UniProtKB/Swiss-Prot annotation:
Belongs to the TRAP-alpha family. Residues 1-21 form the signal peptide. The chain crosses the membrane at residues 208-228. The keyword Endoplasmic reticulum applies. Residues 34-75 have a biased composition (Acidic residues). Residues 229-286 are cytoplasmic. Residues 268-279 have a biased composition (Basic residues). It is found in: Endoplasmic reticulum membrane. It comes from Oryctolagus cuniculus (Rabbit). Phosphorylated in its cytoplasmic tail. This is Translocon-associated protein subunit alpha. Glycans are attached at N136, N191.
Length: 286
């Protein structure tokens, strides 16, 4: 009798545990509810992803349109179809460093309205990236009106920097103009890669300095040799030899006063040469 209450208590504890472990009706219901909830969340996430993709697809055309509008606004103006331009380099397409380069730009108005040519500019740019400026030359203001079916010619000149010699650069020459309606145009008259030639003719500063140094060195050598010869000549004195006159008749006495000459003659009278006696030969007549 004492064991019966204990068995009942044990059954009461073990039965619920076995029901929970085996997944009784309540457990299966909970699992079913969980599965249905998971399926609903998956379907909701799929629907949300599809909505996001649809929104992205709808936004892409608008973004492309905005990008195109920004490019149109920020892009440089183009040339007008009613105008033609030509270019002619005066000395050919040679670009010597530190020397003037001249060219002529011709503008032809083929339209029915006037064009106002505003300016002409040129620049050297990096060959791999034309957005990077190497040397930007001064823009030439023109402000010239070109009527329809008329032509105009403009001259421009620039000097490439001396350190740029022997290297390639992108040369860009732009002609800026507009019509009477205010539409701005820009024509890239020349847009190519050129090579700046090192200047060979003429004398640069280094060459002139070298020649001046050589001339000064040569002058110092000449002066040193001259001084050396003079010092040697001074060490050897010249022996003076007194040269007398062969006779008194060769002496000019006109510059001596007459009184002095008289005194000299009295003090040392001249001696006449003695006549030598002639020897008579034997048998000569007396």
């Amino acid at each position: 009798m004492r064991l019966l209450p204990r068995l009942l208590l044990l059954l009461l504890l073990v039965f619920p545990a076995t029901v929970l472990l085996r997944g009784g009706p309540g457990g299966s219901l909970a699992e079913a509810q969980d599965l249905s909830e998971d399926e609903e969340t998956v379907e909701d996430s799929v629907i949300e992803d599809e909505d996001d993709e649809a929104e992205v697809e709808e936004d892409e055309p608008t973004d492309l349109a905005e990008d195109r509008e920004e490019e149109d606004v920020s892009g440089e103006p183009e040339a007008s179809p009613s105008a033609d331009t030509t270019i002619l380099f005066v000395k050919g397409e040679d670009f010597p460093a530190n020397n003037i380069v001249r060219f002529l730009v011709g503008f032809t108005n083929k339209g029915t309205e006037d064009f106002i040519v505003e300016s002409l500019d040129a620049s050297f740019r990096y060959p791999q990236d034309y957005q990077f400026y190497i040397q930007n030359f001064t823009a030439l203001p023109l402000n010239t009106i070109v009527p329809p079916q008329r032509q105009a010619t403009f001259e421009y000149s620039f000097i490439p920097a001396e350190p740029m010699g022997g290297r390639p650069f992108g040369l860009v020459i732009n002609l800026n103009y507009k019509d009477f309606n205010g539409n701005v145009f820009q024509d890239a008259v020349f847009n190519q890669t050129v090579t700046v030639i090192e200047r060979e003719d003429g004398l640069d500063g280094q060459t002139i300095f070298m020649y001046m140094s050589l001339a000064g060195l040569g002058l110092l050598v000449v002066v040193g040799l001259h001084q050396l010869l003079e010092s040697r000549n001074r060490k050897r004195p010249i022996q003076k030899v007194e040269m007398g006159t062969s006779s008194q008749n060769d002496v000019d006495m006109s510059w001596i006063p007459q009184e002095t000459l008289n005194q000299i003659n009295k003090a040392s009278p001249r001696r006449l040469p003695r006549k030598r006696p002639q020897k008579r030969s034997v048998g000569s007549d007396e």
